[in-house]
Regions:
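Bacterial signal peptide processing site
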Residues: 14-17
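Acidic/histidine-rich, surface-exposed loop or edge segments in extracytoplasmic proteins
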Residues: 70-80
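Bacterial N-terminal signal peptides that target proteins for export
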Residues: 1-3
């Protein structure tokens, strides 16, 4: 996140958290560009998602009302949000809409389907959320692990 703040300060880059409620959609679009995903909401609003995956650990949902004004900005890659996924009910499409594309999609021998891996911060600790999606596109399992620390470098 510090890199994004530095970028914004030095180069005029935009970041999702800089926009205050009431900011028009067009202003957000002109500064951030197209969102990774856009979801139409009941009542005419939209929820835009901007992610820093695969290398970053943040994804922000910007919710706009039917009037096109920003209502809220929420960082969604959290242990609480992942933990709230209803297993056996949440679909791959919902996963994309709510969390954005993952860091990577892999397979493991112990599960028939795909494992979607997201990087995120959990109380200052770098973590992975492994979301297991079955062949029908339904989330069946969720695992959290700490991101491995780099090996210490050997001195010659």
């Amino acid at each position: 996140m510090a890199l994004f703040v530095l970028c914004a300060a030095l180069a005029g880059c935009a970041y999702p958290t800089q926009f205050k409620p009431g900011t028009p959609q067009q202003e957000v679009l002109s500064k951030l560009g197209p969102a990774n995903t856009v979801k139409k909401l009941d009542g005419g609003g939209e929820r835009w998602l901007y992610t820093t995956q695969p290398m970053g650990r943040e994804a922000y949902q910007l919710q706009f009302g039917a009037d096109g004004q920003l209502q809220t900005t929420t960082q969604v890659l959290t242990a609480g949000n992942f933990g709230a996924i209803p297993l056996g009910q949440f679909t791959q499409q919902q996963l994309l809409q709510d969390f954005g594309p993952p860091m990577e999609i892999t397979r493991v021998w112990s599960f028939t389907g795909q494992v979607w891996t997201y990087r995120f911060w959990d109380n200052g600790i770098k973590r992975f959320a492994h979301v297991h999606v079955d062949p029908q596109g339904v989330v069946q399992k969720l695992m959290f692990i700490d991101e491995p620390l780099p090996e210490p470098r050997q001195r010659d």
